[in-house]
Structure formats: C-alpha cells, structure tokens
Amino acid sequence: MLLIKNGRVMDPKSGLDQVCDVLVQDGKIIKIASEITEEGAETIDATGLVVAPGLVDIHVHFREPGQTHKEDIHTGALAAAAGGFTTVVMMANTSPTISDVETLQAVLQSAAKEKINVKTVATITKNFNGKNLTDFKALLEAGAVGFSDDGIPLESSKIVKEAMEEAKKLNTFISLHEEDPGLNGVLGFNENIAREHFHICGATGVAEYAMMARDVMIAYATKAHVHIQHLSKEESVKVVEFAQGLGAEVTAEVAPQHFSKTEALLLTQGSNAKMNPPLRLESDRRAVIEGLKSGVITVIATDHAPHHVDEKNVEDITKAPSGMTGLETSLSLSLTYLVEAGELSLMELLEKMTYNPAKLYNFEAGYLAENGPADITIFDAKADRFVDSHFASKAANSPFIGETLKGQVKYTICKGQIVYQA
C-alpha cells in the first residue's frame, strides 16, 4: 500500500482541487479523502506539492527498432517517468517502420517490459511509401492505438481520403504531420530566419497551413476524425478553428517548444533548436497559446525526438537532423510559459497534459478517482529548476539546457509503483 499525504490533489476530469490524501493498492486508487490513516503503508509526504494524474504524451519517438543509438524503448520510458509521464504513444518512423503486424508485435513485446504504459501507432502507408495503406484492421487487432506517418507528410490527397475512410470504418483516427514538400525549402529553419541569417529558403508557413486546410476539409467531407500534429503557425490555429466551426471532427496538439520560444533560438542554440516544424515568430507563439486558451488546441504533446550528439554536432547545420528531446522538460516549460505567465490555470494545463490526450485515444488514464488507475505525478509547481545536460534519455539534444524553469517532478507513480523519484 502507498499513502500520499497532504498534497494538493488535482483532477481535471472531476474538477477536484483540494488538499487531501490518496491511498493506493494493487495498481488502483482505493481512497481519496481529507484524512487517511493506514498502518504499515509506505507514505509520501506531499505537503506543498501537486498530486495530479500521470501525464500522457501522445507523440514520442523512441527510435526502436533500427535507430537505438539515439534512444530505445527502455531509455525513452525512463525519460518519460523522469518527466512525470505514465503513458506515452510512440510514432512509427522507425527502421523498419511499424507497418506490419510482425514489427508491431516485436515493438509491443519490448514496450511491455517497461514500468510505464508504452503504446504505439502504426504507419498509415506501407513503409512510409505514401501510396499503399497498411492493414488498419489487422494492426489495430494486434495492438496499435492509431495511425500516423509522422515525419513524412502525405502528399496524395487520394491516400488521405482513403485513410480517413478506413479509419472511420474502424472507429479510429489518423494523425497527420502537415508540411507540404512542394511548398517548402530546407526543413527546420523558419522562412524568415532562413532568409535573413542563413541565406537559404527555409520551412514556410504556407507549407503547413495549406496542407492542413486540404486535410481538415477532407475530414469534413468524409466525416472522419483527423488529428493535427505539432501545429506551429497562427494561420494553422485559424484553419483548425474554421474546420471545427463547420462541424468537422478535427483535434490538434502543440509542442511545448512552439509556445515557449521563437526562431531566434537557432542563433544561440544552433542545431539543438532545429526541428520540424521549426520554431516560428512571436506572433505564432502567441497564436498557439491563444489556441490552447480557447480550446481549439486540446492537447500538449512533446514530439520527443532524440538524436545522438555526433549527428547534431555537424559543421553544416542544414545537414543536422531535426528534433529535440522533450519528455524531461515538457512540464517545466508548460508551467513556466503558460501557468507562471498567466495564460492558463494549473488545472487547464493539466487537462491538456492528462485528461484530453487520454480521452483522444480512450485510454484508461488521465484522471484521479477511487477505483481508477494509480498513475500519478507529484510535482512542485513553484520550484526553480536549472536544466542541465544530465537526462534519463540517451540524448541531450535540448535547446533548453542552461535555462532556469519552473516546476520539478518529485515522484512518478505508475500502476501503483514508484517509477521515478527525484
């Protein structure tokens, strides 16, 4: 038995927000009350700390199989636990891609060994070829939770329509990475800084929001659910809002980096600040925050994208891979740039990091209730935290190293077990 005493218990599902005790047994929460005494229970003193549902991240890259020099499922799960996450959804752009039942089963076997809940999508098209759909039905039955070709946009509108129709038939959805290659230059650099500082043609805003406009309208026509991944532009928020206003089933996520920083970070952090989509303008940063506040964007997801130090430290920054490690800084960035900045209440933030992402996939997660799962994150929302280069992840490609942020995870509890302790 585990007894959590005197914490500020916050549950976005029920709206519970009060100082009380939580008793855990056999992977479940068995009691939430103002005062619980339990002889012999292991006790955590959570005085002054927030006791929240375990965080849920629906967009991570754990690089297994095929790229385990960057990360693997085990180190990814450790990074998740250190960041307060108890449930994550891996993307399928591995080597080989997760496009068939055999590869999926091997990945899920590896995931099952971890102390947190590690789930995965499968690809929309076979080996990312953009032309032939995978066997959605067989992959769902084998344990995939959804479908995404994240990393590579789907250029064929015909395939997008077919994928949406198939997903709708099976009561699932597809998640899309929106960057039209035909409208884009060098990825990872926003068009403004690319032109002015790097003297190259960079990643354009129109490549994101034009492709999104196509796909949300196909979703509208097919009455299918589409989830837009890591949007970054002011116009993109408007596109989602427009589609939702029409009655289309469109959901969207934003990554912490896109509401925290702008393209200028490339000048001080170099390749660690290079990502797809890129960091944008201050007007875009403000717009995605407004999208979170209005409810147009319902989910915060990291797009945790670890890379080996040698891959990032190349002479020509345009040759460095895009992406940053995100699981261990997500909560702190969100507390700093949303809650401390007065943009969202702590409860509103937690909803976008726990209940909403869990609800999207119908996971039994993201809430605190008696008889519910004992997936719990305990953190100090006010603590100052200096981000150093020591991560649980294999990778340290974070542009936030050296920054002081708000918020420190103290305990992560999954299935009733302490899986991380600061």
UniProtKB/Swiss-Prot annotation:
Coiled coil: none annotated. Keywords: Hydrolase, Metal-binding, Pyrimidine biosynthesis, Zinc. Substrate binds at residues 61-63, 93, 276, 307. Zn(2+) 1 binds at residues 59, 61, 150, 303. Pathway: Pyrimidine metabolism; UMP biosynthesis via de novo pathway; (S)-dihydroorotate from bicarbonate: step 3/3. Pfam families: Amidohydro_1. It comes from the Bacteria. GO terms for biological process: 'de novo' UMP biosynthetic process; purine nucleobase catabolic process. InterPro entries: Amidohydro-rel, DHOase, DHOase/Allantoinase_Hydrolase, Dihydroorotase_CS, Metal-dep_hydrolase_composite, Metal_Hydrolase. Belongs to the metallo-dependent hydrolases superfamily. DHOase family. Class I DHOase subfamily. This is Dihydroorotase.
